[in-house]
Amino acid sequence: MAPTQNLFLVAIAFAVIFTASTVHGRHNGAEDIVHSSCEHASYPSLCVRTLSSYSGPTITNRRDLAQAAIKISLSHAQSAAKKLAVVRDSVGKKKQEKAALVDCVEMIGDSVDELSRTLGVLKHLRVSGGSAKEFRWQMSNAQTWASAALTDDDTCLDGFQGMDDGEIKTEVKQWMTKVARVTSNALYMVNQLDETRGKPHDVHL
């Protein structure tokens, strides 16, 4: 084989190895951030499981992590909203669950809107080049929206308290408990982002 061909093959092999090691390093870095950040979340195991399986952009810092957590929560809320709407429309007006379902659909709709607003704030968060005052204002908005979303999730669940157990109640509790838990974890990540912000020039968020 000619020397030129040998060099070409060596170059290709090196490129493949370098790319693989880089991807592996990023993956390990993301796993480290996820595990360390989820340790004190409201639901640590769920936190690790959902964020580890996140298929969005690579998580390289805490801002990425907070955005990923909110996206996961938003996805669960949107899925639950669709299911709840179907159940609401299929239940007779005289059923005791009807009023609770109507309220729950409204609550989860508000939750979806609030999580979307939270995500919008995080996407435009000034982690560098901005003043501490501006950062605090942005974080206050993100925390307010995420907290409101969690409140709406809990309010939906509260609407079924005192009702007889049944298929509808069981399904709604299952869906909304999952939404509330991932939202609680997401709120924790947003709060952690605020606590670890540091100075205005800190870009390792």
From Swiss-Prot:
GO cellular component, one term: apoplast
Protein location: Secreted, Extracellular space, Apoplast
UniProt-recorded Gene Ontology molecular function terms: enzyme inhibitor activity
Top-rank lineage group of the source organism: Eukaryota
Pfam families: PMEI
GO terms, biological process: regulation of shoot apical meristem development
Disulphide linkage map: C38-C47, C104-C156
Induction conditions: Down-regulated in leaves during infection with Botrytis cinerea.
Keywords: Apoplast, Disulfide bond, Secreted, Signal
Expression sites (tissue/organ): Expressed in apical meristem.
UniProt similarity note: Belongs to the PMEI family.
Entry function: Pectin methylesterase (PME) inhibitor that can target PMEs (e.g. PME2 and PME3) in a pH-dependent manner, mainly in slightly acidic conditions (pH 6.3 and 5.0) but not at pH 7.5; this processus relies on changes in the protonation of amino acids involved in intermolecular and intramolecular interactions. Regulates de-methylesterification of pectins in the apical meristem and affects primordia formation and phyllotactic patterning.
Protein name, UniProt field: Pectinesterase inhibitor 3
Species this chain originates from: Arabidopsis thaliana
Encoding gene (name): PMEI3
